[in-house]
Structures are given as structure tokens and as C-alpha cells.
Amino acid sequence: MAKKSAVAREVKRRKLVEANFQKRAELRKLAKSLSVSEEERERAREALNKMKRDTSPSRLHNRCLLTGRPRGYLRKFAISRICFRQMASMGDIPGVIKASW
């Protein structure tokens, strides 16, 4: 089980990313655009640098919905490999059966 503070921090980051996604995208577009002046691009880069670090989507880390475990995350099921194995063996995940050949 992950620390509650780590899970809460991740939730906070997700909210920040969602709230600032549009503004960040516009600034990135301006910073990369060759059609605007160099001065304008520089201002856009500075504005991006002044934004909070946690507004960047690259700071997000997927976590298990049940335990908060950050590693061994299965995207399709949004849980960790350990929880997946337990739930699959108990038959709690529809359509998942143990392979045999």
C-alpha cells in the first residue's frame, strides 16, 4: 500500500495538469512557431519556465486504483500487476482466464 501522501500528491498533480493544459499548449505552440518574432518566442519560453513544475504532464505517474502502487501498472485495467493477478485468479475481472495450452 502506497503512502496516502504520495497518492494525494499525484491527484493534486493531475488536477494541475488538467487546469493548465490549454495554456501550456498555447505557450508551447508559440515557442515553437517560426512565424512569430524571436522576442515573442522567447517570452513564451520564459512564461513556460515560470509555470509550476507540476503542470507538466510528464510529471504524472500512473498508480494502481486499489493500492496506489506506482510500479507494475497495467494500463488496460488501471491496476498493478499484483492486484491484477489476485483479482484474475478470483475471477473478479470479466473475460480474463488463466492461459493453458
UniProtKB/Swiss-Prot annotation:
Pfam families: Ribosomal_S14. It comes from the Bacteria. GO terms for cellular component: cytoplasm; small ribosomal subunit. Signal peptide: none annotated. GO terms for molecular function: rRNA binding; structural constituent of ribosome. GO terms for biological process: translation. Keywords: Ribonucleoprotein, Ribosomal protein, RNA-binding, rRNA-binding. PROSITE patterns: RIBOSOMAL_S14. Belongs to the universal ribosomal protein uS14 family. Binds 16S rRNA, required for the assembly of 30S particles and may also be responsible for determining the conformation of the 16S rRNA at the A site. NCBIfam families: PRK08881.1. HAMAP family: Ribosomal_uS14_1 (MF_00537). Part of the 30S ribosomal subunit. Contacts proteins S3 and S10. This is Small ribosomal subunit protein uS14. It comes from Chlamydia muridarum (strain MoPn / Nigg).
